[in-house]
């Protein structure tokens, strides 16, 4: 059985975000656990903090690198140097970080379960409708086959039967016709209900995606707040923590919540903005060229079905024109500029377009069969390349892939990254936070610095570094021994121009 949910872009986006949220939740729990043990181990000084730093480092190894994880890595290093922290710090951490985090994580877990249940419920509706269509189709095919057999029996035995026997067969044929029409209408209604259940499921995925995205933003903000609280308490301790705090301060000053949220959006983005909805098309007994039905009989039965589709297409087209007029009025009139009304109207437009595409695909398929029967060229339609078949035992099924825009706007990179004038300035700085351009300035490393990301430089005490760029968040960009990268400004001192020339010549 084909799964109608597998290739849905909405489903892929939601699952990707759900997986990302699970990793984020695990990371947040690891951080909370580390802070709790940090608070408990404060009274045991260096030994306890050393073990905790190792635990934190392991937790960070399985976490995606970003601003927050880098800052927490520096927090791990500060734990190694803060062996003399006393009980007051532990209580402050427990009260201001651990307790709020537990509350937020507990609330988010309940919300995520509720969102998952809602998605699963609507997904089951899509699958059930899909299965009902196939079941109704099989039933209609069998009834049509029996009806045709009875029809041919009546036609072939008109001359050999008495009037009474002939009337009996005609009554039986009439009942069979009524039953067939009822089953045909039931199958048609189930087929038409397919698009509404599909839309409901996709809309639920979209809404649940937005809700889960807000939870992730809240979690990132919580981690940032915890990190800032942690920094403030560390700053209260004396001269013994000065060197350690310099390191963690540099890392915290580099934290950019918006950058992490952008990373979240990029991590969960899909590769293609194209969304294809798969819908079953109505298949009829009359379409199969292998059945014993004659051509004229086929044509007489297909034409009413085609007429029904044409009437529905005309109605849907009129509805579309009306929606377009309303949408145009909303956009042009200031009194109707309500964003929610426009969003609702766009949703109705999307629903109408999907219904119209389904009707046109069904109409094209039946028109093509009728054209073959009447020995004339097949009609042309864009959906001809989007209709596919697959076989299941003795039956074949037809479905159409309808391309639709994703209503959820994922990454608006063009707007967020382009300059105000719309042109790329080749002479502009690669980062908006650059405060000055340093042309061949030199500086000397005062402390050893171990790089934690690929774009950072390793420094040894006494190294002479060429500075290319100074940034306001406390990090500079330079080169050392042929390698370029970032390094903390607090770890170096600038050399005067003359000293820099001497160091260069040496």
Swiss-Prot record:
It holds the Pfam family SH3_9. Gene3D superfamilies: 6.10.140.470, Arfaptin homology (AH) domain/BAR domain (1.20.1270.60), SH3 Domains (2.30.30.40). Residues 438-497 form the SH3 domain. Keywords: Cell membrane, Coiled coil, Cytoplasm, Cytoplasmic vesicle, Cytoskeleton, Endocytosis, Membrane, Nucleus, Phosphoprotein, SH3 domain. Residues 419-435 have a biased composition (Low complexity). Induction: In F9 cells, by retinoic acid (at protein level). It comes from the Eukaryota. Its main location: membrane. One of its GO terms (cellular component) is plasma membrane. It is found in: Cell membrane; Cytoplasmic vesicle; Cytoplasm, Cytoskeleton; Cytoplasm. The modification Phosphoserine is found at residues 114, 479. SUPFAM superfamilies: BAR/IMD domain-like, SH3-domain. Residues 160-230, 305-334 form a coiled coil. It is a peripheral membrane protein. Multivalent adapter protein which may decrease NOS3 activity by inducing its translocation away from the plasma membrane. Seems to repress its own transcription. This is Nostrin. It comes from Mus musculus. The gene is Nostrin.
């Amino acid at each position: 059985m084909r799964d109608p949910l597998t290739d849905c872009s909405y489903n892929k986006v939601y699952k990707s975000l759900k997986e990302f949220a699970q990793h984020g939740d695990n990371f947040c729990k690891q951080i909370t656990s580390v802070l709790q043990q940090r608070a408990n181990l404060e009274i045991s000084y260096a030994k306890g903090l050393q073990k905790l730093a190792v635990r934190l480092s392991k937790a960070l190894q399985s976490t995606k690198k970003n601003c927050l994880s880098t800052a927490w890595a520096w927090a791990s290093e500060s734990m190694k140097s803060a062996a003399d922290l006393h009980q007051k710090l532990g209580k402050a951490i427990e009260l201001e970080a651990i307790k709020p985090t537990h509350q937020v994580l507990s609330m988010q877990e309940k919300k995520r379960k509720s969102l998952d249940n809602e998605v699963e419920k609507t997904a089951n509706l899509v699958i059930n409708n899909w299965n009902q269509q196939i079941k109704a189709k099989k039933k209609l095919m069998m009834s049509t086959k029996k009806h045709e057999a009875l029809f041919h029996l009546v036609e072939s035995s008109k001359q050999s039967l008495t009037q009474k026997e002939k009337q009996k067969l005609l009554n039986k044929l009439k009942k069979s016709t009524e039953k067939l029409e009822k089953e045909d209408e039931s199958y048609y209604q189930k087929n038409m209900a397919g698009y509404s259940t599909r839309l409901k499921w996709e809309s639920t995925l979209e809404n649940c995606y937005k809700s889960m995205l807000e939870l992730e933003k809240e979690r990132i903000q919580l981690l940032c707040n915890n990190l800032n609280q942690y920094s403030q308490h560390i700053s209260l301790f004396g001269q013994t923590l000065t060197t350690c705090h310099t390191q963690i301060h540099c890392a915290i000053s580099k934290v950019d919540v918006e950058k992490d949220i952008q990373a979240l959006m990029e991590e969960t983005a899909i590769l293609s903005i194209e969304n294809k909805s798969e819908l079953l098309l109505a298949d009829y007994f009359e379409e199969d060229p292998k059945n014993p039905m004659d051509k004229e009989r086929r044509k007489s039965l297909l034409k009413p079905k085609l007429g029904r589709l044409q009437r529905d297409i005309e109605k849907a087209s009129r509805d579309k024109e009306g929606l377009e007029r309303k949408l145009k009025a909303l956009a042009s009139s200031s009194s109707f500029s309500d964003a929610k009304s426009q969003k609702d109207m766009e949703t109705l437009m999307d629903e109408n377009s999907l219904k119209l595409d389904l009707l046109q695909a069904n109409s094209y398929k039946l028109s093509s069969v009728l054209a073959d029967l009447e020995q004339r060229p097949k009609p042309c339609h864009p959906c001809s390349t989007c209709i596919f078949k697959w076989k299941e035992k003795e039956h074949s099924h037809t479905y159409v892939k309808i391309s639709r825009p994703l209503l959820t706007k994922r990454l608006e990179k063009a707007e967020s990254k382009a300059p105000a004038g719309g042109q790329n300035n080749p002479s502009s700085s690669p980062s908006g936070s650059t405060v000055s351009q340093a042309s061949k300035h030199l500086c000397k490393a005062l402390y050893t610095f171990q790089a934690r990301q690929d774009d950072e430089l390793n420094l040894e005490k006494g190294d002479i570094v060429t500075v290319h760029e100074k940034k306001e968040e406390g990090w500079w960009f330079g080169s050392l021994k042929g390698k370029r990268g970032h390094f903390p400004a607090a770890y170096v001192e600038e050399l005067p121009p003359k000293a820099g020339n001497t160091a260069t010549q040496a």
